[in-house]
Amino acid sequence: VPGFRHEEKFTLNDPAVQKSPLADVRELILKPVETDADAARRVREALLGMGREGDFGRLGEAAEWLARWQRRFPPRIEKPTLAIFAGSHGIVDAGVSLSSNSDTRAHIEALKGGRAPLSAIAAQAGATVRVFELALDRPTPSIAKEAAMTERECAATIAYGFEAVEDQPDLLAIAVSGAGVGTAAAAVACALYGGSPDYWVRPSAQTPASLSGKRSELVSAALKLHRGHLSDPLEALRCLGGRELAACVGAIIAARHQGIPVVLDGFATTISAGVVHAISPQAVSHCLASHITQRPAHEAALERLSLAPLLQLQFQTGGGLGSATAIGVLKTACAPFIAKPVEG
């Protein structure tokens, strides 16, 4: 992020610093960022020259959004990155997930080795896959017993998320991997938006009802334990979330300050954006919802952020499939503005 380095902005190891480490994060979220309204206007004018208003539908809207946030015309995607943030959760021991922390490790190893289906989809889109492992061998504590992170750990993890933009991509797609992350995200959603745990842990049709009950009980216990901290979105993230959610928050913040559009994936990344949105709605205007999963809570979260999904492909969950697929669609949105005319 222009103007500071991680070690300068987050003086996490300086005992002389009295304010909360998360105060710096809040300041970055609230700090205004300039966009390029002229580039967006040129997209609109070019579209009108290609046909009637609205002919290009969501593609036209996406092109305008890209130009505004890339701060250039024509918009183009030449260096996209797909960032996968992987974490582990102590709540898995309570039986709230169909997968385990060892499954997360296996998935990450497959991604790093280029063997996962997601690797092929990202390659087809021309995206670089970057995997960020967040202490996979040290699960966060069960949020029903203690906070997921200390203030310093949460702030440091948010700062670590800044590294997703260190290669200066012109589009950043984000996703998470972690058994239990959906339940943690549901707990954060309860704190941000209210409603019952049952509402936010609502599963897809393939999830056993018994699992939903365990998730709801755990979220209820966590909300009761941390009830004195949940009026602050960053505190809700710290107490109820996980490292991958915090790193996504950091990636979203850093991308905005560097003029990099962000493509969200599933429910968990949407809730990470929700944390930022709860502090400043304008601070997520550079984010686009790639798709909508079959998890009902995902649709509810998108509604809270006033985000319409670009795609509806009936994916069961996130995991990067939606955000990776959307990269190709967004490249298509740019094509009319950068195509060279064919000479007859």
Predicted regions and their residues:
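N-terminal loops that bind phosphate or other acidic moieties
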Residues: 8-344
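Extreme N-terminal basic, low-complexity initiation segments
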Residues: 2-5
